[in-house]
Amino acid sequence: ILRNNVYLGEKYDARKEIKDWDKPTFNASSWKQVLPVPTPPQGKLTAQMQPPIRIREIIRPTRMTETRQGEFVFDLGQNMAGVARIKVKGPKGTRITIRYGEDVYSDGSLNVMTSVAGQHKTVWNANQESAGAPPTAWQEDTYILKGEGEEIWMPQFTFHGFRYIEVTGWPGRPTLDNIEGIRLSADLKVTGEFSSSNELLNRLHRVLDYTFLSNVFSVESDCPAREKFGYGGDIVGVSRTFCYFYDMHNFYVKAIRDFANDQRPLGGFTETAPYNGIADQGLGDGSGPIGWQLAFAFLQKQLYEYYGDKRIIE
């Protein structure tokens, strides 16, 4: 892995793979000895509270369009959060670029601006550009082939929000069988269901549920593409609903700790947790608006009312 970033994507060079490096029989005598870290990480080491990220669904594309020579756009038929998985065979060193978007232009080409990272909209300066950032922070993954028969790959340390996948650099012409959409989210246990005699209500519920799961990874986010921030106001708005449908206990314990970790010196709470500098119409000192600050106390009340857990209050 040459780069991984939840906004800019992952870059993977399969030529650099070390075969069997994780097996006890591997000869690591040429490896250098580890060195102690001069300044260790701060804070207290604790167990991970949130559920692991799992594959929820594998979505096959419904059509492929060659928008320009060597540029192919795959339509998954629905919006989702996750990554693309490719199956490819080609020469060593072939570089495949995958970009993601929620819409296409009238000519069928990918509209990457529908899912660029919101806090990176402007052109990067020279120093940032040299670090590998593109002029526009679109969602992009890169895979470099090792050239050893069929290769199957998907990013491991990023996720995107998208419906359309653009592929360039493919050796030859891909088919619908070469690309899959891997839908991801936190592995929340289902605790409730909804159905009614009204199909419109049923469809609305399915859309709401699908949207919610697209926004639960390490935080309960506002969107899986542009920002991916854990806004307190968004949590206050929907947490009660989804406590009926999923076991949100550990996920919300983690969210409370996130807000506690970023509490401001004057006592206020940030608009997002983890804190990223956003303080729209806050009270100063980096605090967020009152409705967003309420997430800290509101979630503690939710844990008590829905799960009988008063430990975090105590």
Predicted regions: what they are:
Residues 275-308:
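Charged, long alpha-helical assembly modules
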Residues 1-226, 233-234, 250-253, 266-284, ...:
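Extracellular/oxidizing-compartment recognition motifs
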Residues 226-236, 247, 287-298:
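Aromatic- and histidine-enriched alpha-helix N-cap/loop-to-helix transition segments
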Residues 170, 237-248, 295-312:
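Well-ordered alpha-helical scaffold segments within catalytic/enzyme domains
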Residues 202-205, 209, 249-260, 297, ...:
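Hydrophobic core segments within long, regular secondary-structure runs in both alpha-
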